[in-house]
């Protein structure tokens, strides 16, 4: 959606975006809200149909996230193409299969550090679209509530990307998250090599119990204020990493890119959270 709105400058560029987005979204609709690969099989996480999400116990954990995802895809396709079939598909999922209600069923955490950042990143990206493009006040309020629930869980992780998405979707302009986001960006290491880091020996940290998540033998914890370590005291590749992990192995042979900084930085500037 943002590429179409901000980056595609010419009508030819916009036409190509429309065709590409329409083809992908039509594929999902034509295959019963499933992403089917060239071998005829549904991809690992490409299940968005009501029978699976609402009635198959194998998929109940994905009910909320995948409902958010498919509604986001349909809303972006509607926004970009203006085609009523995408709005009608979303209306059917919402009216007949309670997909908007599904978005409110956020994961129940077992305490600090028990989330899944990959799922959270997907949810935040999709909720950014839904809160940006939805015009129905009732649906917008539901999407904002879903975002609020997820943002509350993410706040201790000091992630500027999640904070800016949350604040933008909820129309907030001030809070502790604002200074914490700027602090994270200011501290963000210029050295993007994966050097080994060890913090588990520190006496100023609280070690999380093993039941918080299935992390194997990884030692996980936080500062005594309940927040994760500052960004320059841990390694970050992308924002779907585990920020609660205290020890990170590495030998300096992997170079991460700069997207983890650039995406929240420019989002913060565009949405007005970062001032000159």
Model-derived features: where do they sit?
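Short, hydrophobic/aromatic alpha-helical segments in well-folded domains
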Residues: 3, 24, 73-76, 126
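Long, well-ordered core segments of solenoidal/helical folds
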Residues: 19-39, 85-107, 142-162, 223-243
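Terminal, non-catalytic domain-edge segments
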Residues: 123-276
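Extended ligand-binding groove/face enriched in aromatic
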Residues: 1-61
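Short coil/turn connectors between adjacent alpha-helices in alpha-solenoid helical repeat scaffolds
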Residues: 11-12, 81-83
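Long, internal scaffold/assembly segments composed of regular secondary structure
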Residues: 56-68, 74, 82-155
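Charge-rich, low-complexity amphipathic helices
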Residues: 43-51, 99, 112, 149, ...
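Positions within ordered alpha-helical repeat solenoids
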Residues: 6, 30, 34, 76-79, ...
């Amino acid at each position: 959606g943002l590429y179409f709105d901000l980056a595609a400058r010419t009508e030819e560029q916009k036409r190509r975006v429309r065709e590409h987005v329409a083809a992908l979204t039509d594929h999902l609709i034509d295959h019963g809200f499933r992403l089917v690969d060239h071998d005829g099989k549904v991809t690992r996480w490409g299940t968005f149909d009501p029978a699976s999400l609402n009635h198959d116990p194998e998929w109940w954990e994905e009910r909320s996230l995948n409902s958010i995802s498919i509604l986001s895809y349909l809303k972006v396709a509607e926004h970009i193409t203006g085609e009523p079939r995408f709005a009608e598909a979303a209306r059917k999922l919402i009216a007949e299969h309670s997909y908007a209600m599904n978005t409110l069923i956020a994961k129940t955490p077992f305490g600090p550090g028990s989330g899944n950042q990959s799922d959270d990143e997907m949810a935040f990206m999709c909720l950014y679209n839904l809160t940006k493009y939805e015009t129905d006040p009732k649906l917008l309020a539901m999407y904002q509530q879903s975002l609020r629930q997820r943002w509350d869980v993410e706040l201790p992780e000091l992630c500027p990307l999640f904070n800016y998405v949350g604040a933008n979707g909820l129309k907030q302009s001030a809070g502790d998250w604002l200074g914490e986001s700027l602090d994270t960006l200011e501290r963000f290491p210029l050295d993007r090599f994966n050097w080994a880091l060890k913090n588990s020996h520190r006496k100023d940290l609280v070690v999380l119990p093993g039941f918080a998540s299935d992390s194997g033998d990884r030692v996980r914890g936080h500062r005594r204020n309940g927040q994760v370590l500052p960004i320059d005291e841990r390694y970050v590749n992308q924002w779907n990493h585990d920020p609660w992990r205290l020890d990170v192995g590495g030998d300096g042979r992997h170079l991460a890119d700069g997207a983890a900084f650039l995406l929240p930085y420019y989002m913060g500037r565009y949405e007005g959270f970062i001032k000159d």
